[in-house]
Amino acid sequence: MVTTAERTNVGFITQVIGPVIDIEFPSGKMPAIYNALRIQGKNAAGLDVAVTCEVQQLLGDNRVRAVAMSSTDGLVRGMEAVDTGAPISVPVGTATLGRIFNVLGEPVDEKGEVNISETLPIHRPAPSFTELETKPSVFETGIKVIDLLTPYRRGGKIGLFGGAGVGKTVIMMELINNIATQHGGVSVFAGVGERTREGNDLYNEMIESGVIDKDDPSKSKIALVYGQMNEPPGARMRVGLSGLTMAEYFRDVNKQDVLLFVDNIFRFVQAGSEVSALLGRMPSAVGYQPTLGTDVGALQERITSTMEGSITSIQAVYVPADDLTDPAPATTFAHLDGTTVLSRGLAAKGIYPAVDPLGSTSNMLQPDIVGSEHYQTARAVQATLQRYKELQDIIAILGLDELSEEDRLTVARARKVERFLSQPFFVAEVFTGAPGKYVTLEETIKGFQMILSGELDDLPEQAFYMVGNIEEAKAKAEKLKA
């Protein structure tokens, strides 16, 4: 949404270079950096053209350089540009739930206008130190493998790594469902520079799984903001801020816990790089913008916990050419509190969620934060799985019988642990027919302790597959016996 401006400050286009536009204003009436400018008129074919752009540079001689948020096709020199006097503003509040917006906060889901009572500018300062919640607390997701091995920080930032088809979307939807049902929270999804088809599929899957209520959008658990691959770099660079602004309202005004999904954080950096080059800035390492650290920081520093509520962010991270030293992912890593890595090997085994228990990390997994019992259990689980991984080559060549008694026991327990890390999801119920399970952290720790202590050595390993807590595994074992 761009605020409707009175025509008090009107400039004229002097140059159009792709998505970058130079505009001349009357002397003494230069718009401020980040102000939204509205260009409306008719193109050469007589068709209406309406473009919103954002001021990025003041060039001198009463000229500004702005970046367009939509295609500049049809713009010509001499066209009028009206200064709105404020940054781009987007609708906020419960009216946004269940709807899809573009970078300007305009609905793009063909469901009509949004009943907006309030809008907020997308450029806002990060919360001050005095407003921040400084004591780290664990955000319980109800997903065993995450809560035990890579606990999420309330108000933290988590990188989600995984190729196509290993279950990123399903984990995202389960988290959206669980924060709504267990924490009374809502979610915001910012689609930054990804495929339009994927955005469409995600929306339809959310309707199928009940995350979005098509008949009554106000009962939905998420708002979606899309700036897809085919859009100009200006839109892709700002859509993350549009989504974040909606999330901040839920946190600061509604005092809720919010999940913010950003897919993909690399595309945000990539768009900034494109814009930087078009603005004529000297490129930095590997061709990225010289302001890379500032750009990423401006987004990431606003994602945090305050005394009122929290924004916990899960960011899909594309690593170009699998090079972790590339400046884009390297800058992002500096802000992350944890990483959730999805493994194709586990997905091939049918173990979902396919979170890699050895490759995923969290800086919350410390005894003074999660407690000694949780920490010891998590490390024991990882040690057992690591030993199993080391023994797999021997098993493949010589067979299980060649192992020592102790190693055979380790393998048996590791296979049970691996299966117990799987879990039926609520959002997958419509596809699998298996009812979803929310497992508390207490039940999760107790279950893994019982497996590792040898209490359940006599139960078959298939009893641990796709169950919630350990009591369900015992009940399943009884059924299998019968």
Curated annotation (Swiss-Prot):
Tell me the keywords, alphabetical order: ATP synthesis, ATP-binding, CF(1), Hydrogen ion transport, Ion transport, Membrane, Nucleotide-binding, Thylakoid, Translocase, Transport
Do you know which SUPFAM superfamilies this protein is assigned to?
C-terminal domain of alpha and beta subunits of F1 ATP synthase (SSF47917), N-terminal domain of alpha and beta subunits of F1 ATP synthase (SSF50615), P-loop containing nucleoside triphosphate hydrolases (SSF52540)
Question: GO molecular function: any one?
Answer: ATP hydrolysis activity
Give the signal sequence positions: none
Residues the record lists as binding ATP: G162, G163, A164, G165, V166, G167, K168, T169
Question: GO CC terms on record?
Answer: plasma membrane-derived thylakoid membrane; proton-transporting ATP synthase complex
Subunit details = F-type ATPases have 2 components, CF(1) - the catalytic core - and CF(0) - the membrane proton channel. CF(1) has five subunits: alpha(3), beta(3), gamma(1), delta(1), epsilon(1). CF(0) has four main subunits: a(1), b(1), b'(1) and c(9-12).
| Family under the similarity heading | Belongs to the ATPase alpha/beta chains family.
Protein name (database record): ATP synthase subunit beta
Please give the organism. Synechococcus sp. (strain PCC 6716)
